[in-house]
């Protein structure tokens, strides 16, 4: 269990150096980097590129498998586990087409959760011909790039992807309701900036603001 505070990253070690050192000791590397908007997934790709290059250059005898345990864009392991459960409940993947799933924002007593779960769900479920509805209050939008992927997936699979700020509309005739809390997009951007500046007091103030907003 490593983070920037426990590794040599805190002392200026590069992504390439860290990735290669860990790779000497691991067959599988899981990375979770979900709190930095616009940076988490990018960092994971930097690690993948570094390990791939290390293997090509002969530094690493073998290239470990890298697993996205959650980033700012997606939470693939959870989304796939949820999909397997849904497939089981409806008796097979062939029975998913036309089923309506409402991915809905929900209240949570904890502050500012990442956007990756709702984004992972709308990105995956739309690939199976399902009618996917993303429901949330105004200000809780997800990445527009992910919405575009969901819309394109739905078009190809014969399903649909819609957005609404009306929860009753989203839940009407839904076969599945998936409640999940996530932070306002603007707040996630602000938190990324605060973390980057090392502003611990600003982060604490933002946490209080998000709790009140929840």
Where on the chain are the PLM-derived regions?
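Glycine-rich phosphate/diphosphate-binding loop of Rossmann-like nucleotide-binding domains
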Residues: 1, 87-180, 185
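Phosphate/diphosphate ligand-binding glycine-rich loop within oxidoreductases
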Residues: 1-87
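Intrinsically disordered, low-complexity coil segments
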Residues: 6-9, 50-65, 90-98, 109-115, ...
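Short, structured secondary-structure boundary patches
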Residues: 11-26, 152-160, 190, 201-202
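Charged helix-capping and loop-helix junction motifs
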Residues: 13-16, 115-120, 194-195
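Short amphipathic alpha-helical segments
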Residues: 43, 147, 189-191
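Short, conserved loop/helix-junction motifs that constitute active-site signature segments
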Residues: 60, 95-97, 126, 208-214
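Glycine-rich phosphate/nucleotide-binding loop
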Residues: 180-214
């Amino acid at each position: 269990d490593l983070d920037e505070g426990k590794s040599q990253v805190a002392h200026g070690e590069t992504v390439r150096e860290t990735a290669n050192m860990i790779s000497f000791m691991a067959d599988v590397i899981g990375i979770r980097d979900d709190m930095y908007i616009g940076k988490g997934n990018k960092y994971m790709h930097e690690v993948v590129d570094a390990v791939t290059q290390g293997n090509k250059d002969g530094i690493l005898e073998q290239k470990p498998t890298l697993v996205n345990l959650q980033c700012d864009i997606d939470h693939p392991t959870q989304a796939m586990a949820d999909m397997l459960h849904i497939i089981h409940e409806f008796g097979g993947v062939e029975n998913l087409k036309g089923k309506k799933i409402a991915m809905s924002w929900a209240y949570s007593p904890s502050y500012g959760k990442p956007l990756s779960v709702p984004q992972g769900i709308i990105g995956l479920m739309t690939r199976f011909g399902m009618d996917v509805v993303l429901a949330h209050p105004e200000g809780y939008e997800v990445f527009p790039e992910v919405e575009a992927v969901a819309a394109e997936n739905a078009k190809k699979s014969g399903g649909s992807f819609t957005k609404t700020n009306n929860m009753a509309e989203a839940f009407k005739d839904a076969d599945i309701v998936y409640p999940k809390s996530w932070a306002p997009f603007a707040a996630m951007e602000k938190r990324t900036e605060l973390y980057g500046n090392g502003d611990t007091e600003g982060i604490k103030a933002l946490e209080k603001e998000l709790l009140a907003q929840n």
